[in-house]
C-alpha cells in the first residue's frame, strides 16, 4: 500500500485518447484530469460508449494515451517501458471486471494466490496471504472450490480478493456488479466499500448504477470524452 502522503496515489493530467483507422479518427477522451487520494473511493458514471473503460485502461497502464500523462505514486506511468509499466502495475494496482476471469481449472485459493505466484513469492507464504484475503471477503469456507462450484456473487468476491491480495494502492473496477442481480450487486458493492475503509485502498469504480455510485465519496461523470 502507499505511504500516508499528500501526493495522490494515482493521477492523470490532460489525458486524451484517439483511435485511428485509416483516415478516420475517433477521439474517446479529451483532456481528462483526475487525482485519487490514498483510501479514496471514486465512482465514474456515463453513457455506454462514453469512454469509461478506456479511461480505466489508461489509468491502469493497459494502454497508452494519445496525449497527457498518468502518474502512479508521482511517477510518469505512461512514459515507462512496457516491461517497467507491467512491473509497477502488478505491484501497485488491482483490477476487477464485470466478468470474474477466474481460471476454471484452479481452486478459489489458487486463483487468488496466482498474482503472488507470478511474483515468485514462496508458495506457502502466497497461499497464507490468499487464505487471509478470502476470509476477508467471506469465502474462508470455499478455499478448495473451483469457480464452477461458486455462485455468481462468490466468484466476484473471489475476483475482488485476487485484486487485493497484492496489497495494491488502488483498485480499478470496471462494472464489477454489472453481471449480478440487484441483491448480489448490493452485497458485492457493500464488500468493496468495507474493504476500502478497512484496508485504506483507493477504489475507482466504473458503474452504470447511479444508486450504487452515489455511495462513493465522489461521483464523476464522463460525457463526450470529458470528466465532470
Swiss-Prot record:
Residues 10-228 form the ABC transporter domain. One of its GO terms (molecular function) is transmembrane transporter activity. Its EC number is 7.6.2.-. CDD domains: ABC_MJ0796_LolCDE_FtsE (cd03255). SMART domains: AAA. Its main location: membrane. Keywords: ATP-binding, Cell inner membrane, Cell membrane, Membrane, Nucleotide-binding, Translocase, Transport. GO terms for cellular component: plasma membrane. It is found in: Cell inner membrane. The keyword Aminoacyl-tRNA synthetase does not apply. ATP binds at residues 46-53. The complex is composed of two ATP-binding proteins (LolD) and two transmembrane proteins (LolC and LolE). Belongs to the ABC transporter superfamily. Lipoprotein translocase (TC 3.A.1.125) family. PANTHER family: IMPORT ATP-BINDING PROTEIN, LIPOPROTEIN-RELEASING SYSTEM ATP-BINDING PROTEIN LOLD. This is Lipoprotein-releasing system ATP-binding protein LolD. The lineage of its organism: Bacteria, Pseudomonadati, Pseudomonadota, Betaproteobacteria, Rhodocyclales.
Amino acid at each position: 500500500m502507499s505511504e500516508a502522503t499528500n501526493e495522490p496515489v494515482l493521477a492523470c493530467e490532460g489525458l486524451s485518447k484517439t483511435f485511428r483507422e485509416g483516415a478516420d479518427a475517433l477521439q474517446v477522451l479529451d483532456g481528462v484530469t483526475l487525482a485519487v487520494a490514498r483510501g479514496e473511493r471514486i465512482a465514474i458514471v456515463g453513457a455506454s460508449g462514453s469512454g469509461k473503460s478506456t479511461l480505466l485502461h489508461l489509468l491502469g497502464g493497459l494502454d497508452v494515451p494519445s496525449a497527457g500523462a498518468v502518474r502512479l505514486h508521482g511517477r510518469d506511468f505512461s512514459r515507462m517501458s512496457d516491461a517497467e509499466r507491467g512491473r509497477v502495475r502488478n505491484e501497485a494496482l488491482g483490477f476487477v471486471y464485470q466478468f470474474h476471469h477466474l481460471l476454471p481449472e484452479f481452486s478459489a485459493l489458487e486463483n487468488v494466490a496466482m498474482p503472488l505466484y507470478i511474483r515468485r513469492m514462496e508458495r506457502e507464504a502466497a497461499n497464507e496471504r490468499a487464505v487471509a484475503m478470502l476470509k476477508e471477503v467471506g469465502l474462508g469456507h470455499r478455499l478448495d472450490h473451483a469457480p464452477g462450484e461458486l455462485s455468481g456473487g462468490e466468484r466476484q468476491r473471489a475476483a475482488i480478493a485476487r485484486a487485493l491480495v497484492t496489497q495494491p494502492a488502488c483498485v480499478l473496477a470496471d462494472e464489477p456488479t454489472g453481471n449480478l442481480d440487484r441483491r448480489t450487486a448490493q452485497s458485492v458493492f457493500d464488500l468493496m466499500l468495507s474493504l476500502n475503509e478497512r484496508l485504506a485502498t483507493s477504489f475507482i469504480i466504473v458503474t452504470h448504477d447511479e444508486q450504487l455510485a452515489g455511495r462513493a465519496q465522489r461521483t464523476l461523470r464522463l460525457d463526450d470524452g470529458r470528466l465532470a
